[in-house]
Amino acid sequence: MFNTHSVELDWGGRPLKLETGKVARQADGAVIATYGETVVMATVVSAKTPKEGIDFLPLTVNYQEKTYAAGRIPGGYFKREGRPSEKETLVSRLIDRPIRPLFADGYRCDTQVIVTTLSHDMENDPDIVAMVAASAALTLSGVPFMGPVGAARVAFVNNEFILNPTLDEMVDTQLDLVVAGTATAVLMVESEAKELPEEIMLGAVMFGHKHFQPVLKAIIELAEQAAKEPRDVVATVNADLEKEILGIVEQDLRKAYSIPVKQDRYAAVGAAKDKVLEHFFPEGIEPRYEKLRVLDVFKDLEAKIVRWNILDTGRRIDGRDLKTVRPIVAEVGVLPRAHGSALFTRGETQALVVTTLGTGEDEQYIDSLAGTYKETFLLHYNFPPFSVGETGRIGSPGRREIGHGKLAWRAIHPVLPAHHEFPYTLRVVSEITESNGSSSMATVCGSSLALMDAGVPLKRPTAGIAMGLILEGDRFAVLSDILGDEDHLGDMDFKVAGTEKGVTSLQMDIKIAGITEEIMKVALTQAKDGRMHILGEMAKALTAARAELGEHAPRIEVLQIPTDKIRDVIGTGGKVIREIVEKTGAKINIEDDGTVKVASANGESIRAAIKWIKSITSEPEVGQIYDGTVVKVMEFGAFVNFFGPKDGLVHISQLAASRVQKTSDVVKEGDKVKVKLLGLDDRGKVRLSMKAVDQTTGEDLEAKQKAENAPAAE
């Protein structure tokens, strides 16, 4: 019934198996990839006819994790998987980025790649397995895909690179880098690093590229057994059309792409486009070409003219040379009520970044296949349509916003203080108010400034820069701080973030083959120079974290209590802790290990809550004086609540210095008194004294008497 084919190899010390022909046989391509005991299924379906009226590849990639893969049932009311998690969105992008450039030019058939994690062994992260499975399914599908693509994760532990580290090995790593590419080229890099030098980052990229070569061979071997007949893609020859359009608007486009202001430039390009459309589509005459084809060629010519100008003159669209960074203005403290804020402007790109300090109650609970954990650093990136002078949708963040936010998160995360040193939940929000390239790196710069403005003690300020590359034959140009147009028209764009010490994040997308290790080395060196310049400009606003937290930020104090006292602080049904919170106004968070975090914007509120907690968890000391409340009056004395839930007896003989006939003559229930702990009687009952304490000042009268008698005795 099944015509199965499979290949197996040892990869990174674990078996990798790729199998097809048994599951999802109605898809154009389907592969089950097994790595250790992590199992991922990838399917590809592509429409048989092109989609009309579009000039792009209609490709959709969906990665999904099923909770049954980890032997769990989803939470929530409906008990089934819902909207994609952040990780699912990020892995979908990881799969999409290296495969998209490899589809044949002009392919316009709706294509959907669905990748599903079926089993997770808690050792091997499914993301790399998902990338391999998707590549294999595309290679088998008959879709015009110029792959296969391989992928690998690289860690750096004890000065050594590790291929596809397990989840346990990732705990100690200084680097988390994912690299993908073909046999001859690197296509994508995504990483987070602990301030590593550029040489190690590049070494990790080449290490990963070298070690996923066996996977490429395995996919090719499987394709030789089971690949479908490749689909025909008719390449459109546009040489004559291109020559005709050049004759009409070449000079117009060259002038347009020398206008530095984005909106003015777009207007000039639009006028050139209208001129072409008027030429090819006059009223009342049958057109010689399809409109979409003319516009496609026009767009290609835009790219060529920009590239020619840069390579021939060394000058860019806005007049800069290859290495110059646009003018920078950095400001902090721009919002009066925010805990920390910054406005970072670089040319026509601008980010308003705001930091908010929160408590343990604000931590984000993340439910993943590997288990539930709490995240104390959140970074959210918003890209409203007005930032590019357009109208558009406003609502929940899209994939691009989630991806850019995570890139900035990776750049900042390595320089944050340890949570036990700075026990706050941090939320950073970047509002992109203007955009003309590199808004994610503006977010990195603005986030660093806003965090320091809030008093968060970062290890070092962090900056980011977006780089571009244009390659034509043996000629190439590396561009620092690219514009939006240069991003679209170049062959490689990569973003590097870091401190003066080293790189914290590197993201790279390469659109063509032929980019060598030497070219990447030149690009990384130029990026470092640009980063240092940006750090210098940021230093004009702020060089380190402010010594004090913002006026409106909460204060957090941390104390440790014995774990067996946690129940006493919480009380039956939370009664005690609710009372502390209500009466002091402080927020209290208690961890299972006895760590207690007390937070409030009011220092007095924190001190009152801590005093209350200590009164519950500490043992009273003999000879110490305590504030108390009379809770019961008896003939023989009064019971006083003096140390949290603890009560003690003030015998009638200890109520006052003079003889007392009736207890009620001195105290009544509810009276606030000061008592001294005398000790325990034979039955273990607490003995207290009021007469040993000045009820007005709280002074220890016994100690005072002893001090006065001491000189007389001498």
UniProtKB/Swiss-Prot annotation:
Chief subcellular location: cytoplasm
Pfam families: KH_1, PNPase, RNase_PH, RNase_PH_C, S1
Positions bound to Mg(2+): D487, D493
Cofactors demanded by this protein: Mg(2+)
SMART domains membership: KH (SM00322), S1 (SM00316)
Domain S1 motif: 623-691
GO cellular component: cytosol
Compartments in which it is found: Cytoplasm
EC annotation from Swiss-Prot or TrEMBL: 2.7.7.8
Domain KH: residue ranges: 554-613
Swiss-Prot/TrEMBL catalytic activity: RNA(n+1) + phosphate = RNA(n) + a ribonucleoside 5'-diphosphate
Similarity section: Belongs to the polyribonucleotide nucleotidyltransferase family.
Protein name: Polyribonucleotide nucleotidyltransferase
